[in-house]
């Protein structure tokens, strides 16, 4: 016997929402999904009227749905935003080159300007070349650090007020688990924040899909017939995040609400005043925001350029110590020159 849509619209149910278990028709699902994102945006004051917002676009399901929904809500609720697409080309053959074609399709479909920046032009390296140097064990460290800074660089070039990323509820729950397992209190503090960064020296990042389940994002893209790229990064299978994702999926089988439970728990965490907070400043080399001197991107890049790519790996790597020592020696030489010039 056909099941009726729970919203009592008179239509037959076409799906069951993973988040609530409600049986809904497609139109009611679209309305509920979009309304929840609008509530997230408005209740968290993610944007202000007249702002220019860069949508971090990879061509995947999350960024494609984010671009589609932001354009829709911007028009429906008159946010008054100037939306642009910002994409980073890491230089991964057979993955990013193909996904960028989808990003260009997004540009045409949503009539948004698109800016593409590559690791090659920013750092002089592609991920293919980096992996050839270091192997596959730590490639996500390089890619993650470079990508975060590349988005900042692109946002600065575009003159935007904020960057909207496609992080969904599953991503955030996985990150909470990863930071707990690694004992990374610095990242654990801010990984559930819906808005990060900001201030005089950095461009804020916002997560409009923070409370949206990955399964529902896939369903929305499917029923809306959105064009997106679904191939996984060729280097991703070795990522540490994969273990957290598998663990989360196992937990979800026995407790369907576990994703939101973990996010809410992460939001409620409190740390003792004695726990040191990393102080964010400006990297003296590249001029971008960092919690260390020099920034991690500069440390990793220095290792690559010296032919010692693993120098920057680890919480307090050999590369960090080497560069810190060089900075100390440089400061001593400058001080000695000042004293010499005084005579």
UniProtKB/Swiss-Prot annotation:
Family annotation (SUPFAM superfamilies): Adenine nucleotide alpha hydrolases-like
Gene Ontology biological process: protein urmylation; tRNA thio-modification; tRNA wobble position uridine thiolation; tRNA wobble uridine modification
Compartment(s) of residence: Cytoplasm
Native organism: Drosophila ananassae
Gene Ontology terms: cellular component: cytosol; cytosolic tRNA wobble base thiouridylase complex; mitochondrion
Record-linked InterPro entries: CTU1-like_ATP-bd, CTU1_C, Ncs6/Tuc1/Ctu1, Rossmann-like_a/b/a_fold, TilS/TtcA_N, tRNA_thiolation_TtcA_Ctu1, UPF0021_CS
Enzyme Commission number: 2.7.7.-
Function recorded in the entry: Plays a central role in 2-thiolation of mcm(5)S(2)U at tRNA wobble positions of tRNA(Lys), tRNA(Glu) and tRNA(Gln). Directly binds tRNAs and probably acts by catalyzing adenylation of tRNAs, an intermediate required for 2-thiolation. It is unclear whether it acts as a sulfurtransferase that transfers sulfur from thiocarboxylated URM1 onto the uridine of tRNAs at wobble position.
Any Pfam family the entry gives: zn-ribbon_14
Family: Belongs to the TtcA family. CTU1/NCS6/ATPBD3 subfamily.
Metabolic or biological pathway, per its Swiss-Prot or TrEMBL entry: tRNA modification; 5-methoxycarbonylmethyl-2-thiouridine-tRNA biosynthesis
MF annotations from Gene Ontology: nucleotidyltransferase activity; tRNA binding
CDD domains in the cross-refs: CTU1-like
Name of protein: Cytoplasmic tRNA 2-thiolation protein 1
Keyword Ribosomal protein: no
Entry keyword Ribosomal protein: no
Top-level EC class as recorded in UniProt: transferase
Keyword set, alphabetical order: Cytoplasm, RNA-binding, Transferase, tRNA processing, tRNA-binding
């Amino acid at each position: 016997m056909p099941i009726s849509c729970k919203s009592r619209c008179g239509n037959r149910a076409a799906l069951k929402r993973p988040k609530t278990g409600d049986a809904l028709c497609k139109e009611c699902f679209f309305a509920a999904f979009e309304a929840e994102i609008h509530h997230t945006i408005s209740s968290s004051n993610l944007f202000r009227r007249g702002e220019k917002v860069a949508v971090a676009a990879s061509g995947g399901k999350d960024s494609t749905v984010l671009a589609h929904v932001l354009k829709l809500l911007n028009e429906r609720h008159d946010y008054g935003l100037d939306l642009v697409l910002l994409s980073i080309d890491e230089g991964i053959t057979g993955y990013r080159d193909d996904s960028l074609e989808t990003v260009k399709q997004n540009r045409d479909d949503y009539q948004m300007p698109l800016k593409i920046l590559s690791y090659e032009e920013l750092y002089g390296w592609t991920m293919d070349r980096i992996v050839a140097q270091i192997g596959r064990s730590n490639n996500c460290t390089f890619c993650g650090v470079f990508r975060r800074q590349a988005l900042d660089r692109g946002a600065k070039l575009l003159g935007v007020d904020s960057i909207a990323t496609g992080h969904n509820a599953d991503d955030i729950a996985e990150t909470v688990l990863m930071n707990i397992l690694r004992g990374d209190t610095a990242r654990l503090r801010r990984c559930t924040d819906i808005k990060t960064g900001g201030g005089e020296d950095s461009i804020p990042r916002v997560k409009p899909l923070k409370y949206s389940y990955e399964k529902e994002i896939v369903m929305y893209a499917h029923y809306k017939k959105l064009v997106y790229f679904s191939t996984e990064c060729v280097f991703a299978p070795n990522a540490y995040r994969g273990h957290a994702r598998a663990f989360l999926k196992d937990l979800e089988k026995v407790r369907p609400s576990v994703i939101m439970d973990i996010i809410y728990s992460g939001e409620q965490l409190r740390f003792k005043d004695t726990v040191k907070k990393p102080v964010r400043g400006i990297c003296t080399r590249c001029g971008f925001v960092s919690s260390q001197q020099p920034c991690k991107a500069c440390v990793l890049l220095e290792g690559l350029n010296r032919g010692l790519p693993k120098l920057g790996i680890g919480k307090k790597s050999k590369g960090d110590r080497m560069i810190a020592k060089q900075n100390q020696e440089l400061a001593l030489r400058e001080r000695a020159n000042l004293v010499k010039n005084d005579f």
